[in-house]
Every structure is written in structure tokens, then in C-alpha cells.
């Protein structure tokens, strides 16, 4: 039905007859001349109906309206120089219509696809929202990413293997979506939260390099970067060290950024989990933000330096200094607003100081700020030297008297807010990093052990006896890839020993009966020569969100759910 896409026509097509199919984006009737912008997935082309060249076609064109779907045959010609539209890729040419047919008419649209619309209408009429050029670009970018994935994985010897969508209910960390069985009354399947167990079983089978692009399902509270169903680039290997996997995945991500954005990513920094939590207060820090934290708790954990706002019987005070480059510009009103904000995040107290050095001499300085009311000069000098503060900076010192709460997490929100408010973050740059050496376990609010990553993650340089002795001291062989504050990939070496996996299940409080009932087939597989294996999963939605500059993964999913897990277009669930 067509010989070319509208958005691909250029000067090389001048003089050629083309057949186009698409939707009328704009319609302009000047009597003897009618112009339409015809739109398809590749863009728009101006079409001219000239009464002096084809009177019958021009008269028929008067019936056309916006969003009619038509087929059109015409001749490509160059536009006069004074009529070239440099704002669009086809702006140097137009098509003179010879004939057309209306494939379908259109009612007036319930939303204006040339503008931004309210979120509810966009989701209700998603099939129309997707007609917007920006949405076409986002979905096409997503498709290009998937093509790169397949090409790279095949070149590296990975096999594309599908795993089941109907599987067993297992305690993987989030709630399952349950599918009742019609044939087996009273029994249920679960939609997979990830292909974790099955890809490990593939390693046991001998498929040493596996990948797939697959849907995963988690019934959890949603955020801007989460959906109840999401797409994962799932990868698993045998006989490969975690260092080698990270190197290979770095190459993979570099290729995606190069081909999609023509950007060469810089060095992938590497931090331990402990380092990023201490320095940035987050396990997914945005390294474009220059604000860094410094632990100065040791200066205040003595009776001599006890602060009036800290409980008298508390010697476990946490104190974190946070240097803000170019923060001297902040007014007292702004500072007060940040203090209020930090306390809303749970902080006990936030002090501040500005320092003006005379003639760049650090020994001659003028100090201004609330710290002078609480901190002596000697202690303050130690803090200033530790943070290497400059004249244009402001220094915040946050305090908390509850050692069971992480003060850096509280300050992380303030760090992010300051970075955005003061325009300290270079929005056009990329800051990739790896985070390694996560704790194997943590305790929840009930004092129970839970996995930091998942229950199949291998401990690092640790045997079963060491694991049992003090689980909270054990480091895992886990790693995350983070770019610009967004975790795009997470992986680990897996447990391939029956005894180690059983020990982990025991620590997590999974009874022997539940181990057999829920994981019996998997535990049996570990007895039959399971190889050392490791892997990683990337969030396709998050990668597409980053590469398109979108603020929400809904923008890169064709038919997403709302934050309440509702499809308001199809009215699901019902």
C-alpha cells in the first residue's frame, strides 16, 4: 500500500512518484490550494493539492479532516528556498498530490496530540497518546535497545532461552501475582518475579551463557521507576568470574549508549556498599552531584563535646558534615527551609557554617553560622580541614542521636535537593559506577534476617561455618550498576553448593519443610554437579527511560499501568 515513509522523504526523492499512507496531522485550505501535513511513524511531509494541476483531487481534498487515515499518490518536488522548513527533516521537499483515498475517517480526538495532556487522559486514550512524535521516538528507541541486546548477546555466544511464565509461588522478596488453576482446583500458579531459579537450573544443565528479554511481575508499591509488570534483560553465565562479567557488561552498556546517543561513557567508578552509604547516603548515588558527606561522629562522642540538643545519656551520636560547593549564595531564609526539610526527613539537628578566607590564607578566616553556638573552634577547624571547605561553599553538619537510624540516608534527600536547587548537577553528563561488596544480610523491623539482594546470592570468601557464626558480618558477591542515580542492573555470583544454600535458607528462617516444599527441585539440582555461575539483570524500562530523558518509566512502555496498578484504558483489573 505504500512505497515510502512520510518522514524519510528528502531531496534525493525529487521527481519520484511515491505512495504514502498515514494520518492528517494538519489541514490548511487556502481555496485554490490545500495543504496537509501527512504523518506516519517516521515523521511528517507537507502535501499540496493544487486546483490548477488537479481540480478534481483538490475538490475532493476539501472533505479531509485532521486524523483521517488516508493513502496518497503524488510527486516529490523541492520546495522554493523561501519556503524551506528547517525545523523538520522533510522540510526541503513536499509532495504534489495526484490522487488519494480515505482509508478511515476520524471523530474529533478527546485529546490534543500536539500538546502535553493530563496523565489520566494520556493513559485512558493511550493509543492516541502514542501518536505523538515524542512517544514514537521513545518506543522506537526502546526497540533499538532490544535489537542491540540480541546482536551483542549472540556475538558473545549467549543463547536466547525462554523460561516459564506460570511457575511456583516462592518467597523472593515481593508479593506474587497469583493465577488460579482451572484444571487443579484450589491450586495456583505464580507469575515470575524473575527467572532466577530457572536460569540457574539452565546453568546446571550446561547452557553456560544464557539471556532473554522477559516480562517480570511484582505486586508491590509503585514508584516513578517501577511497574507491576516490567521488562528485564536477564543474563547468566557459568565458569566466569564476577569481575569478568562486570567487564563484559560494561562493554555492553557502552555499546548501547554509543549507538543510541553517540556518547562514549567515561570510566565506571567502583565503590563498596559501605563507601557509597558513608559518602553519599544512598546505594544508588548520582555522582554528577558534587556534594559529599564526611563522618565526624568521633568528634562528638565524648562528654567534653556533648551537644545540648543530644540526649544526655546518649554517647552514640551520629554527626555528618556535608560540603555544598557554591552554597555561600544561600540566604538565611533558604537555609532555614533546608533545616526544616532535613528535620522532616528525621534529622535531629542541622547546623551550618560559611567561611570567608582572607587572601586565600586558611589561617585567616571569618566564620558565620549556627555552628558557632554549639561547636568550639578547635573542633570546627578539624571539620573544616577534613572537608576542605572553600570561601564560596557552605557546610552543613547534621546530627542524630538514634544509632539505629542511618543519618546519611536522612541527609541523602537533602543532598539531592541541594544539588538540584543549586544547579550543581550537570544534566547533559553521565556518571556510571559499580557498587560491590553488599552485606549478605540485614535485619528487618522484627529482628529477622533478610537478604540484601536475594536468597540465592553467594557470600564472598566465606564458608558455611563462617556464615553461621555472624551472618551480619558476611559480605556478598553482589554488584549493582548505577548511572546518574538510577540502578539499571543488579547481579551476583550464585550459590552452587547444596550445603551453603541450605545454610542461607536456615538463617532466613525458612523451615526444612518449606525448603523442601518450595525449593525441593532446585535444591536437588545443586546435588548434581552444579557449576560456579553468576549473572545480572538489567531493567530495560529504566535504560530506555535514561536514554530518552524521560522522568518516568511509563513514558517508555507502550501500555503502562498507573501508580495504583490500574490499566484505566482497558479498565483492568475488573
UniProtKB/Swiss-Prot annotation:
Positions of L-aspartate binding: 172, 218, 453, 494
GO cellular component, one term: cytoplasm
Protein name: Aspartate--tRNA ligase
CDD domains linked to this entry: AspRS_core, EcAspRS_like_N
Assembly, per entry: Homodimer.
UniProt-listed PANTHER family: ASPARTATE--TRNA LIGASE, MITOCHONDRIAL, ASPARTYL/LYSYL-TRNA SYNTHETASE
Binding of ATP, residues: 218-220, 227, 487, 539-542
Signal peptide: none
Cellular compartment(s): Cytoplasm
Gene this chain is encoded by: aspS
Protein's organism: Blochmanniella pennsylvanica (strain BPEN)
InterPro entries according to UniProt: Aa-tRNA-synt_II, aa-tRNA-synth_II, aa-tRNA-synth_II/BPL/LPL, Asp-tRNA-ligase_1, Asp-tRNA-ligase_1_N, Asp/Asn-tRNA-synth_IIb, AspRS_core, GAD-like_sf
Keywords: Aminoacyl-tRNA synthetase, ATP-binding, Cytoplasm, Ligase, Nucleotide-binding, Protein biosynthesis
UniProt record, GO biological process: aspartyl-tRNA aminoacylation
Catalyzed reaction equations: tRNA(Asp) + L-aspartate + ATP = L-aspartyl-tRNA(Asp) + AMP + diphosphate
Amino acid at each position: 500500500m505504500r512505497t515510502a515513509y512520510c518522514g524519510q522523504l528528502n531531496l534525493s526523492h525529487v521527481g519520484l512518484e511515491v505512495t504514502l499512507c498515514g494520518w492528517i496531522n494538519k489541514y490548511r485550505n487556502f481555496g485554490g490550494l490545500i495543504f496537509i501535513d501527512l504523518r506516519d511513524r517516521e515523521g511528517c511531509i507537507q502535501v499540496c493539492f493544487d486546483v490548477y494541476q488537479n481540480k478534481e483531487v483538490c475538490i475532493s481534498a476539501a472533505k479531509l479532516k485532521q486524523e483521517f487515515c488516508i493513502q496518497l499518490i503524488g510527486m516529490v518536488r523541492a520546495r522554493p528556498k523561501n519556503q524551506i522548513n528547517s525545523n523538520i527533516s522533510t522540510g526541503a521537499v513536499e509532495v504534489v498530490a495526484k490522487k488519494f483515498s480515505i482509508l478511515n475517517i476520524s471523530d474529533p480526538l478527546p485529546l490534543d496530540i500536539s500538546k502535553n495532556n493530563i496523565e489520566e487522559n494520556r493513559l485512558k486514550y493511550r493509543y492516541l497518546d502514542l501518536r505523538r512524535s515524542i512517544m514514537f521516538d521513545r518506543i522506537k528507541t526502546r526497540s533499538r535497545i532490544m535489537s542491540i541486546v540480541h546482536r551483542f548477546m549472540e556475538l558473545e555466544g549467549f543463547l536466547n532461552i525462554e523460561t516459564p511464565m506460570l511457575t511456583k509461588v516462592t518467597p523472593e522478596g515481593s508479593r506474587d501475582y497469583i493465577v488460579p488453576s482451572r484444571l487443579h482446583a484450589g491450586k495456583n500458579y505464580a507469575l515470575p518475579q524473575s527467572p532466577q531459579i530457572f536460569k540457574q537450573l539452565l546453568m546446571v544443565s550446561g547452557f553456560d551463557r544464557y539471556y532473554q528479554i522477559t516480562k517480570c511481575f511484582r505486586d508491590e508499591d509503585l514508584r516513578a521507576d517501577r511497574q507491576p509488570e516490567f521488562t528485564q534483560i536477564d543474563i547468566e553465565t557459568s565458569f566466569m568470574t564476577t569481575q569478568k562479567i562486570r567487564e563484559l557488561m560494561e562493554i555492553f552498556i557502552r555499546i548501547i549508549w554509543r549507538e543510541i546517543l553517540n556518547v562514549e561513557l567515561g570510566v565506571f567508578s567502583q565503590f563498596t556498599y559501605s563507601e557509597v552509604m558513608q559518602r553519599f547516603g544512598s546505594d544508588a548515588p548520582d555522582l554528577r552531584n558534587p556534594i559529599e558527606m564526611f563522618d565526624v561522629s568521633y568528634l562528638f562522642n565524648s562528654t567534653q563535646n556533648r551537644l545540648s540538643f543530644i540526649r544526655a545519656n546518649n554517647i552514640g551520636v551520629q554527626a555528618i558534615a556535608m560540603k555544598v560547593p557554591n552554597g555561600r549564595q544561600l540566604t538565611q531564609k533558604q537555609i532555614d527551609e533546608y533545616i526544616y526539610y532535613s528535620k522532616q526527613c528525621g534529622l535531629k539537628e542541622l547546623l551550618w557554617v560559611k567561611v570567608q578566607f582572607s587572601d586565600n590564607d586558611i589561617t585567616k578566616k571569618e566564620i558565620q553560622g549556627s555552628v558557632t553556638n554549639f561547636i568550639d573552634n578547635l573542633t570546627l577547624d578539624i571539620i573544616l580541614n577534613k572537608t576542605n571547605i572553600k570561601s564560596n561553599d557552605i557546610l552543613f553538619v547534621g546530627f542524630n542521636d538514634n544509632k539505629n537510624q542511618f543519618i546519611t540516608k536522612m541527609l541523602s534527600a537533602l543532598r539531592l535537593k541541594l544539588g538540584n536547587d543549586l544547579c550543581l548537577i550537570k544534566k547533559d553528563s553521565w556518571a556510571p559506577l559499580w557498587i560491590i561488596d553488599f552485606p549478605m544480610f540485614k535485619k528487618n523491623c522484627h529482628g529477622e534476617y533478610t537478604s540484601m539482594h536475594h536468597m540465592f546470592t553467594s557470600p564472598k570468601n566465606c564458608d558455611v561455618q563462617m556464615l553461621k557464626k555472624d551472618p551480619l558480618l558476611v559480605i556478598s558477591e553482589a554488584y549493582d550498576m548505577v548511572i546518574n542515580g538510577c540502578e539499571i542492573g543488579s547481579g551476583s555470583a550464585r550459590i552452587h553448593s547444596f550445603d551453603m544454600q541450605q545454610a542461607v535458607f536456615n538463617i532466613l528462617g525458612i523451615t526444612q519443610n518449606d525448603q523442601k516444599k518450595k525449593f525441593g527441585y532446585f535444591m536437588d539440582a545443586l546435588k548434581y554437579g552444579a557449576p560456579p555461575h553468576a549473572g545480572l539483570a538489567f531493567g530495560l524500562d529504566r535504560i530506555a527511560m535514561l536514554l530518552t530523558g524521560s522522568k518516568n518509566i511509563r513514558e517508555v512502555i507502550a501500555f503502562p499501568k498507573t501508580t495504583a496498578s490500574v490499566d484505566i484504558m482497558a479498565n483492568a483489573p475488573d
